[in-house]
Amino acid sequence: MDSNDNPDYISPKQWQSRGELEILLGHSIFVIDEGATHLPTIVLLHGFPTSSWDWAPIWHSLSQSYRLIALDMLGFGFSDKPNSHRYSIHGQADIVEALVKTKRLDDFHVLAHDYGDTVAQELLARQLTGAGAGTWLSCCLLNGGLFPETHRALLTQKLLLSPLGKFLNRLTGYSKFSKNFSSVFGPQSKPLEQDLENFWWLINVNNGKHIFHNLITYMRDRIEHRERWVSALQKSTIPLAVINGSVDPVSGAHMVARYKELHCRLDYLAQLSVIGHYPQVEAPKEVYSHYQHFIDLLD
């Protein structure tokens, strides 16, 4: 996200100024909603431990043809970060559905990444039972731990999930964060220092670093609800696409292989051979091109 080379660059503070805080299920949630209401709508769901700002590199390109709605989920970005809250994927899905209802969305596309993929799986399961809010037109999943058996968590993530988690929070500084975060990017698409500083700043808004050990419980959720969430992918009546950075050590090519083994619905697949865990940040032009091709195929 180089501000010098990209005229469409949006800084985190500019991003904040373009959105607003909305009260959803009793929590103050940051929402950015741009584009004419007559355009097709995309709801964008971000990953851990970052925020809706992850979508900034492809925002301008998408906004030419779509109304875009992104939120910082509870505990992330500019949204509330309650310390004692019991965070869960189901709870985040409830907030997303509250947003869908507040915006009075009848039908829309979903574009998700990482933690957002898991939220999307729960929402997709609700769609399949007729209990979901609104009607999905499609769902596109970027790199994420769709299957707990193929999710190769970083050591830091495993420690955060342990009883040592809350103590590790206190010891994690910018240097440790930048090293771990950069490790999941592709070898030729590492984040710039400016990007790392921005991601770290967003994490620390509202003292967010200190709830990492509460947010990381989504890894347990994935195991507990595996059957429901994998079944949602297998039985989906909604077109599904996967755009995957293949060299992602957490959920790269090995995750795609498992996706195929389990015969999950797959209407479109793009494998980016030298890209890591954050395709929309590392290769925004390619992600936009593939996503638009997927949508075009639906017509």
Predicted regions span which residues?
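Alpha/beta-hydrolase fold catalytic core
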Residues: 1-42, 63-66, 101, 105-106, ...
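Short N-terminal helix/helix-N-cap motif within the alpha/beta-hydrolase-1
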Residues: 50-60, 78-81, 150, 224, ...
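Conserved HGGG/HGGXW glycine-rich cap/lid loop of the alpha/beta-hydrolase fold
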Residues: 33-78
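Conserved alpha/beta-hydrolase catalytic His-Asp/Glu region
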Residues: 150, 172-234
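Catalytic histidine-centered segment of alpha/beta-hydrolase-like enzymes
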Residues: 272-288
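Active-site loop/oxyanion-hole signature of alpha/beta-hydrolase fold enzymes
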Residues: 13, 24, 32, 70-112, ...
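Conserved loop-alpha-helix segment in the C-terminal half of the alpha/beta-hydrolase fold
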Residues: 235-277
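Conserved hydrolase catalytic core segment
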Residues: 106-151
